[in-house]
Amino acid sequence: MSADSTVKRRRLEPEERRAEILAAARKLFDAGNYASVSTSDIAKAAGVARPLINHYFGGKRELYLEVVRQMMVVPAPVTESLPKTTREHRLAISVDRWLDVVERNKRTWLTAIGPEAIGRDPDVERIMLEADEIAADHVLEAALMTDIVEGREELRAMIRSYGSMLRAASREWLIRGTLGREDLRAFLTDSILHLLNVTYPKVLAATRDGRTPPE
């Protein structure tokens, strides 16, 4: 009897089954790495027959890319149901929630942003670009700035750049241990607030004057 046939199966709706496979894959990739995890491992952990992984995702690589996407695209709950309070408070809460997500999925997240992420292929790069755009949307939402029109593209560009700094700073926390979580939370919160409250208005004023912002 094959390993696939001995798996206990529960009857689930397709979306529930897909989510269950994703959750199992995320845990396995977080505990190991892309090369060390097989589709058989994932099928066993998810309680499904191996062909179902191909049915829902196409194969191990496609499943891994979806896991990467889940890790890199800032989840909606990070900015959902924020209190109707100040920009500072809302952004501090969002940063704290985001750190929770990264801490829970440390290894998978680090692999996704690292050079070993299946060769840093174009699909991973595409996911990173998508993640940057969605993160910019979430920052604007948390900062109560979704209606900004003037200088919007420049503002989004600065927020995307902040995202790159955020990833580098998070590696200092998770890998080097040079920053504690509270240090990182304060650094990330203060940095985005300075960008929105000081840098963006300065760039906007310079653009209105038709000149380059001073050094």
Regions found by a protein language model. Name each.
Residues 64-71, 112, 127:
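Alpha-helical DNA-contacting segments of helix-turn-helix folds
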Residues 20, 24, 28, 32-62, ...:
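Helix-turn-helix
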Residues 76, 122-146, 156-168, 183-186, ...:
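Amphipathic alpha-helical packing segments from all-alpha helical-bundle domains
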Residues 18, 39, 61, 65, ...:
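Short, structured helix-loop boundary elements
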Residues 66, 80-107, 149, 185:
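Hydrophobic alpha-helical connector segments
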Residues 102-126, 137-140, 168-175, 204-205:
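Amphipathic alpha-helical segments used for helix-helix packing
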Residues 20-28, 74, 93, 97:
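Pre-recognition alpha-helix immediately N-terminal to the DNA-recognition helix
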Residues 1-16, 202-215:
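N-terminal intrinsically disordered/low-complexity leader segments
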